[in-house]
Amino acid sequence: MAAPPARPDHTRLLHICLLLGVLVEIRAEQIRYSVFEEQEEGSVVGNIAKDLGLAPRELAERGVRIVSRGRTQLFALNPRSGTLVTAGRIDREELCDRSPNCVTNLEILLEDTVKILRVEVEIIDVNDNPPSFGTEQREIKVAENENPGTRFPLPEAFDPDVGVNSLQGYQLNSNGYFSLDVQSGADGIKYPELVLERALDREEEAVHHLVLTAFDGGDPVRSGTARILIILVDTNDNAPVFTQPEYHVSVHENVPVGTLLLTVKATDPDEGANGDVTYSFRKVRDKISQLFQLNSLSGDITILGDLDYEDSGFYDIDVEAHDGPGLRARSKVLVTVLDENDNAPEVTVTSLTSSVQETSSPGTVIALFNVHDSDSGGNGLVTCSIPDNLPFTLEKTYGNYYRLLTHRTLDREEVSEYNITVTATDQGTPPLSTETHISLQVMDINDNPPTFPHASYSAYVPENNPRGASILSMTAQDPDSGDNARITYSLAEDTFQGAPLSSYVSINSNTGILYALRSFDYEQFRDLQLLVTASDSGDPPLSSNVSLSLFVLDQNDNVPEILYPTFPTDDSTGVELAPRSADSGYLVTKVVAVDRDSGQNAWLSYRLLKSSEPGLFAVGLHTGEVRTARALLDRDALKQSLVVVVQDHGQPPLSATVTLTVAVADSIPDVLADLGSLKPSADPDDSGLTLYLVVSVAAVSCVFLAFVTVLLALKLRRWHKSRLLHAEGSRLSGVPASHFVGVDGVRAFLQTYSHEVSLTADSRKSHLIFSQPSYADTLISLESCEKSEPLLITQDLLETKGDPNLQQAPPNTDWRFSQAQRPGTSGSQNGDDTGTWPNNQFDTEMLQAMILASASEAADGSSTLGGGAGTMGLSARYGPQFTLQHVPDYRQNVYIPGSNATLTNAAGKRDGKAPAGGNGNKKKSGKKEKK
């Protein structure tokens, strides 16, 4: 890179000349203004724009501004008007102190021409400060014996203003003792002096108050003042003097310690130590110093000890006063003590009995005491008294002795202890009295038996209470005390239901709390009568009895018990018959239940919980009658399953359910064609049923597989033109036939030949279940066939299928059940009031077994219903005369809502037919009703 060419020297010289020219021009251009101090902010100092010959708007264009530095900016440039104004209040005294000339400089820069303008502003003083003294008050001490003409310097005033506004002179207020003289120093400062004109007397006037005034020459004139206190210093030229030569005072005896007796006073006109007077006792005796005290500064005489008139009634005290230098004065204080009734009577008990039996006779001496008063005259006369409401009296014997006696017989139950206050009062003014307290205990005797607050008690206990439960707390009161009031509780011995009462309840002998020793059952007993005895421990003991009725409250703790229909022992359900010709409202059967509870807990309601055919049957809410809700149709399934729930109204409610199987057919043979419910073999070693089931399942499976194979072959023949379907068919040849259940035509086959094997834990009791086949001569729809349930066939029935002689015979159309022949509780036929229920579950099971046995005989056609051996007497027992009756004694507790009857031994009416006569369990067979 080439080096830059060197500048010629004449260029540098040109710059220096220009700079010098600017400096010369700057010095030449200087502006001077003046302004008074204490002007408001924004006050105009001068017009910069006018002095520079510029228009106001050119100031901003040319960049005119103040560049002064180093101190607070006092001025500002108004850019609109071009004037120089004050930036705040200006204090000349703060800025220039006492300098006679106060000038401040500032510089203004013109940026376009780089010119600096120098401006001087003179601050003109105003009289804004008055003369002031350093202190508002000055004290000057002058001895009272000072000679006239003596000078005393006074404080100087200061005025920060200058010139004529500064301090000009002093003035002193007029007085008869002092004058003012002002001296001027070489520096021009004036010094004021105080001059004593005549002799002083402190006792005449101790302090002189003067006012010194300083003033300036401003307009208006300002001034300042200072207070001058001339304090005269005393000399000891006077002795103390008492206000009285003798002081007389009277005081009552026994005044409190510290009481002010009187104040002695001595005066001394001197001041300070010369006038400070102190007091003291003169010729002090020990007795005086113990009873009286003199304050050495104030002269107060106070009581230091107890004054007693009996000791001394008069005191003579010498008092002395002296000032600081030692001048003294003397006086006397004469004290008279006044007598007062200051002694209260004294009571001394010489004999006292602290306790007395409540049976003591009137006039028994309780105490003997003496009274004494150390005062004399009326102050020593004493009278004694006791409260009027007490059963005691005072008797004065001799001298000042008194006896305290009983006035009547005492009763400890009314008042067990007496606090007797004996008051002894003298006749002084004011009277003084003394109280003595005598405590007397009244000893108890056993004269009150325990009492119960109630004549009898009743307690209510819910049944099923836990053993040891608290039933009731019984409390007896005995107004006696001690052992006479210690009560024990017991139960009177008795028996209930052959057992002692002590096995049912017990009572705490100390607290009277009754406890249950067993869990009560409302169904066993409902109330218990007890006799509670309360005995005290006195000698002899006293006692009282009170009766207690214990009522057991019923709880809903018994589930409704279904009496009919009963549950068979083989876990199957009973079968009820409903003819297909039955209309709406036909009584199929009746559910009968009882509840061992009472009240609402035994109020039962019936409702249909579940039905295989909704809307076909209805159950009476309060009667339990199962009736048809509509007429039976041919499409209705042969077997209908109903679940009836029986619920009480307890809290919480309890319920029981029963499952009813209703066979829809006109006669039993119609039912037995497809329905069987026989008792399984009881032989546990018999395995024939299991083998038979296995063989049957295998045979049916083979037939089903063959059918599916044939059906598949027909389908493949129809689709043989399709190679794809042919290939799929060859792959399906090894698939089990059960995969093709959904093929058309199989559904009808399955309806006819489908089967189900129910294997329970005991395979010998397993059932083979067949669905009812569809016959061409029956009018059962496909839907009803699908809804029908499988029928149970036990092993005994299956074994008969192998015998050709045991084939089902045609049903006998005469063997039909009428409405009156159905088992029920309220009489499904015309019965008498003496008909009975089955005595137990065994009878009900026997009834179902006979129905099934008869159905088996009807199936093989080997017997009739004439009551022979083969029928087990079905026609004789399964008729109107065999009605169910509930035997237990709690039937009368059952209330059937909706009727006025209760469950009794009489059979209810049904279907509006009158009952037939009969006795005991032997009933005449009713006529069969034909539909």
Swiss-Prot record:
Region feature Disordered, mapped onto this chain: 801-840, 901-931
Q: Which residues carry attached sugars according to the database record?
A: 419, 545
Q: Which GO terms describe its cellular component?
A: plasma membrane
Q: Name one GO molecular function term.
A: calcium ion binding
What highest taxon heads this organism's lineage? Eukaryota
Residues that span the membrane, as ranges? 693-713
Kindly indicate where the leader peptide sits in this chain: 1-28
User: What is the name listed in the Swiss-Prot or TrEMBL entry for this protein?
Assistant: Protocadherin gamma-A4
Species this protein is from: Pan troglodytes (Chimpanzee)
Q: Mind giving the lineage of the organism this protein is from?
A: Eukaryota, Metazoa, Chordata, Craniata, Vertebrata
Gene this chain is encoded by: PCDHGA4
